[in-house]
């Protein structure tokens, strides 16, 4: 499940909105179905309709439908672009070992990261990286990213200089091993302020992620969704096996 809290200001105690959704891979992205804080459907009838729509989309993928195949190819390109961004991140910073920290019974290696002066930004996202200072924590045994925190050190222009992300914008992400060998985000926080054209914008979100379940590639996921639809009581969270 994904719970997103939105605040007007980062230090506000109470959020102005809270949205909880069940996130299910669709083969061409993810489908987010609204639920309440306990994971129960807000509207069981609407919940079933959304699952039936997901079932149809997965069935088209399994049957090698042309439109869905093209959508999958587009999704694969987006993932490739994301992986290239991750690779760029490795080159965009210089890392200095700070020390070890404990998180529960796990040992984390902490590194400070500074912009690499030799790095040449080739995309809008990369242009942000060269203006970020922060820290990363690596799980010593698993070699996986456990925590990431950074702050924008100077204003970042975007959109042909009609927009700007302001200095001091901040981000944080916590990651845990949710299943053996599978590390996923469990919490993220984004506090970004800036302007676009002549309007100011603020993004202050705290997101938590829980109840991860692996449902496999589209063919396996389709069977999981069909089994769930075959159950009588979709309002019982214990009867639902897919999503997170």
Question: Predicted segment positions?
Answer:
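Structured extracytoplasmic
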Residues: 1-133, 140-146, 151-169, 177-184, ...
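Conserved active-site loop/cleft motifs that coordinate metal ions or position small ligands
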Residues: 187
